[in-house]
Amino acid sequence: DRLRSRGLGDVYKRQVKTSEEQNVKSIGNSLTVWRDLNNLEEARMVIFMLADSVAARMRESGLFLARTVHVFARGSDLASYHKQGKLPRPTGAAREIAQTAVSLFEKVYSWETPLRGLGVSVSDFYFGGIQTDMFSDCVKADKQKRLDEAVDKIRKKYGNKIIQLAVVHKDPRLKELDIKGEHVIHPYSFFRHN
């Protein structure tokens, strides 16, 4: 009966526990590209889009900081490559996630074949406060956080494509993608409780 209702588009609202109570292990996004990617610059564009989506999902889930980034790559020969690494400090900033993911990607993918799929995820969530050092720029981080929140509000109201990364405009097909909105993967617990 519940399956039939869902098939007809009926949506049931329920009280959702906080992310800490749900014990979310990771948040990520991946994409199988419509054509082979042949160089780092093309892969970099997709990684930045994926990282932007992952960071937005983190904020949406109430998980603002992660300590580990994982990158996944699949060649056109369908061979898969994985690498993960720790961030210098816990972060929820898309740029830092993307830069770490690009660095990991460069270490794991040798370009023996063109690239067909990419994925970025974060894990090892951090719920405590951050001890700043005298070299960190707290004002800049606070401005970035407020900017991210403003972008999230605008995207929620007008759709994810309304504000895009400049890098996606290098490829006309990339700017048509709505990675966050069209590629939703629910945790198992979502289906178990509905």
Language-model regions, residue ranges each:
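Acidic, metal-coordinating catalytic segment for phosphate/diphosphate chemistry
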Residues: 89-194
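DNA-contacting surface of Y-family translesion DNA polymerases
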Residues: 6-114
